Amino acid sequence: FNRXSPGLQGVSSVPLRTYADQPIDADVTVIGSGPGGYVAAIKAAQLGFKTVCIEKNETLGGTCLNVGCIPSKALLNNSHYYHLAHGKDFASRGIELSEVRLNLEKMMEQKSSAVKALTGGIAHLFKQNKVVHVNGFGNITGKNQVTATKADGSSQVIGTKNILIATGSEVTPFPGITIDEDTIVSSTGALSLKKVPEKLVVIGAGVIGVELGSVWQRLGAEVTAVEFLGHVGGIGIDMEISKKFQRILQKQGFKFKLNPKVPGATKRSDGKIDVSVEAAPGGKAEVIPCDVLLVCIGRRPFTQNLGLEELGIELDPRGRIPVNTRFQTKIPNIYAIGDVVAGPMLAHKAEDEGIICVEGMAGGAVHIDYNCVPSVIYTHPEVAWVGKSEEQLKEEGIEYKVGKFPFAANSRAKTNADTDGMVKILGQKSTDRVLGAHILGPGAGEMVNEAALALEYGASCEDIARVCHAHPTLSEAFR
């Protein structure tokens, strides 16, 4: 949060309040405290705006910190350690363990403590930067007014010059299947299962589906993912990478059923669930029994009951709020960022938009290149990409060249005995400019940031090749 616009020094002197009966006056009121909202609120305060942030949940941080990115990464990391110790991996390295036991309760405790520390960190940053935190459901009750309604029915009115909607997204419901967060779960329930299911069926093999499926597969569940799209990894993934990724996951024990539809699921008297799967082309219809059904068919913008209709702000066909390049809605002092606007539903995209949006309010330049926003799947191996895929380049008629390097030929990957995957760079044929980077392998989520930097700076493939990389490192494969 160090970027500052000229002539906007100092911070707000508004004292911290979590709730008040008297009306509050603000320069900027942010609705939502997820990665986009809390970052925007802090930045606004640092730029000298009197800032209020409204959050409907008890804890700050939104989906990402509480029931998304953060807890899932804790479970992915710890389940990977268990998988290494429980399988043959440690023995092959000369580490012999007589007995490995899973303490799921302890694993969940570690996840929760990480979440608690990070959400508490936001509260500390709010206090440090004089951001007023109001707990309640934010409703825009006028062009310059937001009303926050608390769980007990009491309300707080905020008079404000600018309003920033950062309410994020929610799980997309599946027609005909009711989520109870017990045996039929969304990503939220899948992060807090009380025991490892014998059989887990995942509807959707996108980013969230393969990540959470991997967690429980490593801990001992038999996992089957059913994906209508016909490929693994969701939208945006390069197809060559997707096919290799699927093969690696299958080798780990993950099962996939691609192309079929799921018309519904039925709970049996013994508590098990029968998942109906329609016939895919060339296949046959079947019923897959499971202990837990995880529904991962994506997320939708959270825009209900915000008061948008009353203000004349209409949503697009996908439920998103239309904005201009400065993130303004049709009402110039009401802005929107993150999952409620167009673009990938990613925490880091929302963060960037939040900072840039408030800098724009302060008179600064507003620019974001969505082609430089990286995506990561935090399985093992990881998958990461930024820029264009081969499929996109073909569709756009851009002539390109491909550079590939397998981790099997990388010294560090060899010494780590972790050689699955490859690095794939796409460059423009005529100019040598980097157009996209696709990484499947250990540390892909870290390495992709080098690619994002190259894209942002307009680097050529030769520019990257001429940068001296330390040896032996995994990132040499990128060069």
From Swiss-Prot:
Entry's Gene Ontology BP terms: 2-oxoglutarate metabolic process
Catalyzed reaction equations: N(6)-[(R)-dihydrolipoyl]-L-lysyl-[protein] + NAD(+) = N(6)-[(R)-lipoyl]-L-lysyl-[protein] + NADH + H(+)
N6-succinyllysine modification, residue list: 50, 88, 106, 116, 127, 143, 150, 257, 261, 394, 414
Signal peptide residues on this chain, from the entry's feature table: none
Needed co-factor(s): FAD
Keywords of this entry: Acetylation, Cell projection, Cilium, Cytoplasmic vesicle, Disulfide bond, FAD, Flagellum, Flavoprotein, Mitochondrion, NAD, Nucleus, Oxidoreductase, Phosphoprotein, Redox-active center, Transit peptide
GO molecular function: dihydrolipoyl dehydrogenase (NADH) activity; flavin adenine dinucleotide binding
Modified residues (Phosphoserine): 269
Transit peptide endpoints, chain numbering: 1-19
UniProt-annotated binding residues for NAD(+): 204-211, 227, 262, 298
Cofactor note: Binds 1 FAD per subunit.
Annotated catalytic residues: 471
Residues with PTM N6-acetyllysine: 50, 88, 106, 116, 127, 330, 394, 401, 404
Cellular component annotations (GO), alphabetically ordered: acrosomal vesicle; mitochondrial matrix; mitochondrion; motile cilium; nucleus; oxoglutarate dehydrogenase complex
Functional note: Lipoamide dehydrogenase is a component of the glycine cleavage system as well as an E3 component of three alpha-ketoacid dehydrogenase complexes (pyruvate-, alpha-ketoglutarate-, and branched-chain amino acid-dehydrogenase complex). The 2-oxoglutarate dehydrogenase complex is mainly active in the mitochondrion. A fraction of the 2-oxoglutarate dehydrogenase complex also localizes in the nucleus and is required for lysine succinylation of histones: associates with KAT2A on chromatin and provides succinyl-CoA to histone succinyltransferase KAT2A.
Subunit annotation: Homodimer. Part of the multimeric pyruvate dehydrogenase complex that contains multiple copies of pyruvate dehydrogenase (subunits PDHA (PDHA1 or PDHA2) and PDHB, E1), dihydrolipoamide acetyltransferase (DLAT, E2) and lipoamide dehydrogenase (DLD, E3). These subunits are bound to an inner core composed of about 48 DLAT and 12 PDHX molecules (by non covalent bonds). The 2-oxoglutarate dehydrogenase complex is composed of OGDH (2-oxoglutarate dehydrogenase; E1), DLST (dihydrolipoamide succinyltransferase; E2) and DLD (dihydrolipoamide dehydrogenase; E3).
Protein name: Dihydrolipoyl dehydrogenase, mitochondrial
